[in-house]
């Protein structure tokens, strides 16, 4: 269960994986983009997981219709704004929204730097209108290769003060982290935090690469860390967090069933592991489902669930002062409710 005395966070949440089905329908009509269906009920199976996918790449294809309708920078601005509203409606006090500007730009050849600016504008407007603290993480989509990732990184660096971290996502098996060492050096030189998708489709060696070569402070998913006790000890001792996404890992067939998910073992090992959504619109879930349905099915006790909730703020990419201010704000808000 969610502890209402603590800030509720989601620190692994893809902005471009949370584009509403209704918005896909409306933007498709606005930009004359042929969609696989013309009404919401018929469209939903094409843009939302209805059964577990055979692998990560099959799951990621569900995201493609969301970015296919981004026919202008205004469309990018709109979906960013709606992401903040969705975070508020989900009851989140703090969220780190991550996005790949190259992925969002590519269908309609939008300027990548313009996409970054549009997302920032949408987040700024949403943060003004909705009472949720939002930070942005830039993603490099490794699937498109190192050169495309450099273009993406350059666009993100042009707004370096509005981005808190860099991530690497996409085809983990085909594009290992070691190919991106120079990219992450640039990010660290800019003062950004580092999180990396690793140990989702590949083994623990991918997590070691993310830590040793890319400077990862947090690992997205990280499920295969469970087969390397030395890695788990290292993560526990150094405070490298795991951004667990329970339902997502089932839907991508990364983990067979929730009762086999390693999150409970990560927590008991002392790794600062957290509970997150991943791509809520595509998955058809929200953060409350992860706490109230998925976490108990994964074997977490109330104490362990609370620890994961605490970890969500403890390893967030904000200062200790900002964390304390958020804790105090939440207590005031709950007291006046």
Swiss-Prot record:
The record's free-text note on cofactor binding: Binds 1 zinc ion per subunit.
Keyword Transcription regulation listed: no
Catalytic activity: adenosine + H2O + H(+) = inosine + NH4(+); 2'-deoxyadenosine + H2O + H(+) = 2'-deoxyinosine + NH4(+)
EC number from the UniProt entry: 3.5.4.4
GO cellular component: cytosol
Binding positions (Zn(2+)): 12, 14, 197, 278
InterPro entries, per database record: A_deaminase (IPR028893), A_deaminase_dom (IPR001365), Ado/ade_deaminase (IPR006330), Metal_Hydrolase (IPR032466)
Keyword Lipid biosynthesis: no
Binding site for substrate: 14, 16, 170, 279
Residues forming coiled coils: none
One Gene Ontology molecular-function label: 2'-deoxyadenosine deaminase activity
Residues annotated as the enzyme's active site: 200 (proton donor)
Important for catalytic activity, annotated site positions: 221
GO biological process terms, semicolon-separated: adenosine catabolic process; hypoxanthine salvage; inosine biosynthetic process; nucleotide metabolic process; purine ribonucleoside monophosphate biosynthetic process
Cofactor: Zn(2+)
SUPFAM superfamilies, alphabetized: Metallo-dependent hydrolases (SSF51556)
Keywords: Hydrolase, Metal-binding, Nucleotide metabolism, Zinc
Family: Belongs to the metallo-dependent hydrolases superfamily. Adenosine and AMP deaminases family. Adenosine deaminase subfamily.
Function according to Swiss-Prot or TrEMBL: Catalyzes the hydrolytic deamination of adenosine and 2-deoxyadenosine.
PANTHER family in the cross-refs: ADENOSINE DEAMINASE
Protein name: Adenosine deaminase
Organism the protein comes from: Pectobacterium atrosepticum (strain SCRI 1043 / ATCC BAA-672)
């Amino acid at each position: 269960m969610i502890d209402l005395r603590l800030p509720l966070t989601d620190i692994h949440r893809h902005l471009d994986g949370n584009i509403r089905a209704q918005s896909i329908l409306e933007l498709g009509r606005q930009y004359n983009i042929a969609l696989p269906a013309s009404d919401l009920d018929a469209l939903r199976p094409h843009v939302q997981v209805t059964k577990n996918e055979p692998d990560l790449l099959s799951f990621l294809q569900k995201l493609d219709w969301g970015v296919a309708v981004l026919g202008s920078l205004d469309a990018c601005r709109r979906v960013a704004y709606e992401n903040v509203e969705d975070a508020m409606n989900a009851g989140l006090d703090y969220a780190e929204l991550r996005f790949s500007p190259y992925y969002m730009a590519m269908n309609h050849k939008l300027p990548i730097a313009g996409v970054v600016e549009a997302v920032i504008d949408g987040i700024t407007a949403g943060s003004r209108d909705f009472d949720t603290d939002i930070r942005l993480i830039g993603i490099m989509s490794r699937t498109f290769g190192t050169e495309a990732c450099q273009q993406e990184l350059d666009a993100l660096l042009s707004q370096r003060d509005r981005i808190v971290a860099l991530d690497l996502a996409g085809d983990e098996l085909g594009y290992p982290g070691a190919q991106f060492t120079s990219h992450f050096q640039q990010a660290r030189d800019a003062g950004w935090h580092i999180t990396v998708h690793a140990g989702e489709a590949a083994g623990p060696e991918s997590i070691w690469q993310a830590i040793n070569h890319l400077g990862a402070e947090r690992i997205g998913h990280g499920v295969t860390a469970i087969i390397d006790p030395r890695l788990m000890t290292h993560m526990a001792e150094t405070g490298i967090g795991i951004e667990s996404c329970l339902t997502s890992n089932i839907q991508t067939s990364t983990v067979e069933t929730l009762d086999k998910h390693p999150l409970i073992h990560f927590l008991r090992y002392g790794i600062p592991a957290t509970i997150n959504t991943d791509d809520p619109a595509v998955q058809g879930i929200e953060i409350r489902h992860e706490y109230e349905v998925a976490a108990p099915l994964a074997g977490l006790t109330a104490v362990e669930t609370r620890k994961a909730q605490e970890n969500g703020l403890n390893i967030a990419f904000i200062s200790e002062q900002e964390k304390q201010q958020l804790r105090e704000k939440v207590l005031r808000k709950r007291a006046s409710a």
